[in-house]
């Protein structure tokens, strides 16, 4: 049968109804497309609003071609009058199309009873016929509709309509338009004016030379559609195959699927694919779209899956994608490049002294004490900040001065003013640890301690009496060590020092031990873990740690290198969920202020990420175990994992520790045996908190409690030891147990004590950097980093944009920006609009802190962050709070300027502050102003507040 797609200049539904009722009018129908097939009947069609099984046109009436002579109108490119259609109407073929509308008999005395003739039925059901036509069919009356839907050129419209409307396929209009562009690579015909009449539009289509190419295009489109389906099916198969065999965490798996499709179907990749499958006029129809089969899948494998195959394999990841830079130092103790010559000393002091000796004070008392020290030593030593930062600097400094006060020339440290007790003088030659102690009612004191009684105050004398020095399992050995338990806190800082102590990280000191805050997020419904599961988890984590240590640093002997595990005590049975909080369990910013205006402890912060379970105990091993669960934790399982760096190896910058934690986070998900254990019970991604490796952050020490925020005076969730003995000490584990009880092995900045002798010790080394080549930033994982590479607009590098603002177009390729250049940019282009907004929209008591007579100092912290300080002689001062007027206002609020880029050369600057009070959300980042700074050759826009 022959199909004719037609249109009208008047309402098509009424015109069709006139044809059906054989009511002659002066209207015409305009044939647009014809699909010829030898037949006596011609079906006139309209486009349907809905398509079932990809049928997008349907007939509205049929005519006898012997009467109509359709070819005569097509050859003359003329419209068909309604009279010709009425004369040739084939009622036998047309009547079934509307039979469902004529179910109600119509009685008419004028027609001798029941109406049976078709035209009379249409007449009496005229409203139903019109409603049916309007609901089922699209009835455009203007060429502009066809142009806007199918294309603006002659070839685009004709070929798209022919394939999309007449061929039973599942392609969208956009897909067919792409096929047309690949088929007609050079010429798509003339542009059709949108103001053309329907007659002109019909004559253009009927006389178009592209009519001769319809059959070739249909064959090409079918082949191309088949090729596209095959390519996409292969991409689906590859993505699913990698997802099934890779051990990806749940969230990473979801992001991986999006990344994989964005990589395979990126714009540049599809343009290459179009060139591969473009129409070849010299090839046979069956040879079209057969070049380079599997193109998209092959490129996906090359650009992503092969990389992920290596990146998500532990051995390949550590060998190919992680690089470590270590600096070898001189072994001579008197050399300037030896650890001693470089001042790379760890904590001194005694852990088993005769008494507790040190400074204890709140933040207010600390500020007063540091002010006193500045007054006493101002002519000799540089002034200290009156905050925790100043205390950390004081306790880390190795600077000394000469004095004749004793009658002879001697040297003394500035710490002498902090701890003036003469007996402590020898202990002040080396750095001192700084701790935070959590007191009842959410109060905190800071401690700088030179001597303490660790073992005598913390452990019973007969603690190791029943610990065997023979071969024992880890589980049995752990159960032989019993610690006395306390639950009520004391208001005395000296007493509480041995119950709720946190070590404060000091970036001025080298790091000897890697302290990991490991919070394993449990799946919903997991409310209890068997003992075997917990210890197998620790053994698996130890295996991963040793694999990473051996790969990154060398000189690691897995059979003897110590890894110390501590687990947060389970909540009591009466607690339905993990009341102590969820991930990120012990770290906190530590610049606490007065007790009346201080921040929340870490528990409040932890609850943000808590995902409590509400189920019952689930078995995690295949063996049948009817004993009660060993661990009743819900939501998360908190571990502290501490291991020293290899012998004679230290880290000197917090970024190294954050990078190591990032590597470990990824490695934990790649160990096959460990993944098998973790997958049913947990979400192992990002279990290590990298935030604790910042200056002034603290982490709870092993054997210490947490304060219950609700009760105020009760302690809970003590960090208890789990002994995972290395193989070399399996026969005599007592020495390892003693090492895990030794405080010196559990601190960031203390050299390990009683480190087992190694067959071959390395020379003194400093870890300069650890870098993931694919994910150099600790803020983004592999998926996020790769996603940036396939986005439509790639963000310009910050160095490039800063250079453009400093030097114009000639400097946009600068390799690096110095701190001096960055300061100049901030002073000349960034700070003026920020200050203008401050003075216009903030209270005078806030803005006057940044205006004359105050002198501001801008201190770059990397390329994207600049600290704002006030100069006070040789000292620097911070600011009062920019948000509120607190009851005890202090100049301790840190202010920063963040710089970031977009896809253009515009530079975004944000002014933000960090206040340490509860009212300001306890050290949260508070953004005040964000402005967009256009390049130097563009006008400056107004600042907008955030």
Swiss-Prot record:
GO terms for cellular component: host cell nucleus. A zinc finger (CHC2-type) spans 881-920. Pfam families: Herpes_UL52. Residues 617-626 have a biased composition (Polar residues). It comes from the Viruses. Keywords: DNA replication, Host nucleus, Host-virus interaction, Metal-binding, Transferase, Zinc, Zinc-finger. Residues 596-626 are annotated as: Disordered. The record marks 517, 519 as: Essential for primase activity. The keyword Coiled coil does not apply. It is an enzyme of class 2 (transferase). Its EC number is 2.7.7.-. GO terms for molecular function: DNA-directed RNA polymerase activity; zinc ion binding. It is found in: Host nucleus. The keyword Chaperone does not apply. Belongs to the herpesviridae DNA primase family. Associates with the helicase and the primase-associated factor to form the helicase-primase factor. HAMAP family: HSV_PRIM. Essential component of the helicase/primase complex. Unwinds the DNA at the replication forks and generates single-stranded DNA for both leading and lagging strand synthesis. The primase initiates primer synthesis and thereby produces large amount of short RNA primers on the lagging strand that the polymerase elongates using dNTPs. This is DNA primase. It comes from Human cytomegalovirus (strain Merlin).
């Amino acid at each position: 049968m022959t199909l004719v797609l037609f249109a009208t200049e008047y309402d098509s539904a009424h015109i069709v109804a006139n044809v059906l009722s054989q009511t002659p009018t002066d209207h015409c129908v305009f044939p647009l497309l014809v699909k010829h097939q030898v037949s006596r009947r011609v079906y006139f069609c309209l486009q349907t609003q809905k398509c079932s099984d990809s049928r997008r046109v349907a007939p509205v009436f049929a005519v006898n071609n012997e009467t109509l002579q359709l070819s005569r109108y097509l050859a003359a490119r003329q419209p068909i009058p309604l009279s010709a259609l009425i004369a040739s109407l084939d009622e036998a073929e047309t009547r079934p199309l509307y039979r469902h509308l004529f179910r109600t008999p119509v009685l008419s005395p004028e027609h001798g009873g029941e109406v049976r003739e078709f035209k009379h039925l249409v007449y009496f059901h005229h409203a139903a016929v019109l409603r049916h036509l309007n609901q089922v069919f699209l009835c455009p009356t203007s060429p502009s509709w066809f142009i806007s839907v199918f294309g603006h050129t002659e070839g685009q419209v004709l070929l798209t309509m022919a394939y999309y409307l007449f061929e039973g396929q599942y392609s969208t209009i956009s897909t067919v338009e792409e096929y047309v562009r690949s088929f007609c690579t050079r010429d798509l015909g003339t542009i059709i004016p949108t103001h053309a009449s329907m007659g002109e539009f019909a004559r253009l289509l009927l006389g178009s030379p592209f009519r001769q190419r319809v059959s070739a295009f249909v064959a090409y489109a079918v082949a191309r559609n088949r090729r596209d389906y095959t390519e996409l099916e292969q991409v689906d198969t590859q993505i699913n195959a990698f997802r099934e065999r890779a051990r990806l965490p749940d969230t990473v798996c979801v992001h991986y699927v999006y990344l994989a499709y964005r990589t395979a179907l990126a714009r540049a990749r599809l343009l290459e694919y179009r060139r591969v499958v473009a129409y070849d006029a010299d090839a046979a129809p069956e040879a079209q779209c057969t070049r380079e089969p599997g193109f998209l899948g092959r490129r996906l494998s090359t650009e992503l899956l092969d990389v992920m195959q290596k990146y998500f394999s532990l051995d390949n990841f550590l060998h190919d994608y992680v690089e470590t830079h270590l600096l070898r130092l001189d072994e001579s103790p008197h050399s300037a490049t030896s650890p001693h010559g470089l001042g790379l000393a760890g904590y001194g002091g005694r852990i088993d002294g005769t008494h507790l000796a040190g400074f204890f004070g709140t933040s207010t008392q600390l500020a007063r004490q540091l002010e006193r020290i500045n007054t006493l030593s101002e002519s000799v030593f540089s002034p200290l900040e009156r905050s925790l930062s100043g205390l950390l600097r004081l306790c880390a400094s190795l600077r000394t001065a000469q004095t004749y006060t004793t009658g002879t020339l001697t040297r003394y440290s500035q710490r002498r003013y902090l701890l003036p007790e003469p007996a402590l003088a020898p202990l002040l030659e080396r750095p001192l640890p700084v701790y935070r102690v959590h007191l009842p009612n959410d109060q905190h004191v800071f401690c700088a301690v030179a001597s303490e009684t660790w073992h005598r105050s913390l452990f019973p004398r007969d603690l190791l009496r029943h610990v065997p020095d023979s071969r024992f399992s880890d589980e049995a050995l752990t159960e032989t060590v019993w610690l006395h338990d306390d639950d009520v806190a004391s208001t005395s800082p000296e007493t509480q020092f041995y119950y709720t102590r946190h070590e404060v990280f000091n970036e001025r000191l080298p790091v000897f031990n890697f302290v990991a805050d490991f919070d394993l997020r449990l799946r919903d419904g997991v409310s209890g873990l068997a003992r075997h599961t917990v210890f197998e988890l620790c053994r698996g984590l130890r295996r991963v740690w040793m694999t990473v240590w051996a790969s990154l640093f060398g000189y690691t002997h897995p059979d003897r290198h110590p890894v110390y595990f501590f687990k947060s005590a389970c909540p009591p049975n009466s607690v339905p969920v993990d009341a102590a909080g969820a991930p990120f369990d012990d770290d906190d910013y530590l610049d606490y202020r007065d007790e009346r205006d201080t921040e929340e402890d870490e528990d409040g912060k932890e609850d943000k990420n808590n995902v409590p379970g509400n189920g019952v105990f689930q078995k995690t091993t295949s063996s049948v175990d009817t004993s009660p669960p060993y661990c009743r934790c819900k939501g998360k399982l908190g571990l502290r994992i501490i291991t020293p760096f290899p012998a004679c190896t230290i880290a000197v910058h917090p970024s190294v520790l954050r990078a190591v934690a990032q590597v470990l986070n990824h490695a934990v998900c790649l160990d096959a045996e460990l993944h098998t254990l973790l997958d049913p019970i947990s979400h192992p991604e990002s279990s290590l908190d990298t935030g604790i490796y910042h200056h002034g952050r603290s982490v709870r020490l092993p054997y210490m409690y947490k304060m219950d925020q609700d009760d105020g005076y009760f302690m809970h969730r003590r960090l208890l030891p789990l002994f995972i003995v290395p193989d070399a000490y399996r026969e005599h584990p007592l020495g390892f147990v003693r090492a895990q009880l030794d405080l010196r092995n559990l601190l960031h900045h203390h050299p390990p004590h009683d480190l087992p002798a190694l067959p071959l010790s390395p020379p003194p080394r400093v870890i300069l950097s650890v870098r993931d080549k694919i994910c150099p930033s600790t803020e983004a994982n592999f998926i996020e980093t790769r996603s940036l590479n396939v986005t439509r607009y790639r963000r310009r590098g910050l160095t490039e944009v800063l250079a453009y603002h400093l030097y114009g177009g000639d400097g946009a390729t600068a390799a690096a920006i110095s701190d001096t250049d960055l300061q100049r940019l901030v002073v000349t282009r960034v700070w003026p609009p920020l200050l203008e907004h401050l003075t216009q929209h903030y209270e005078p008591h806030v803005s006057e802190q940044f205006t004359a007579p105050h002198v501001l100092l801008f201190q770059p912290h990397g390329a994207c962050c600049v600290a704002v300080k006030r100069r006070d002689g040789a000292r620097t001062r911070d600011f009062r709070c920019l948000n509120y007027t607190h009851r005890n206002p202090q100049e301790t609020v840190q202010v920063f300027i963040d710089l970031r880029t977009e896809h253009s050369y515009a530079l975004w600057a944000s002014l933000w502050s960090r206040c340490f009070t509860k009212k300001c959300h306890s050290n949260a980042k508070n953004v005040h102003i964000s402005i967009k700074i256009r390049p130097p050759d563009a006008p400056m826009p107004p600042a907008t507040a955030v």
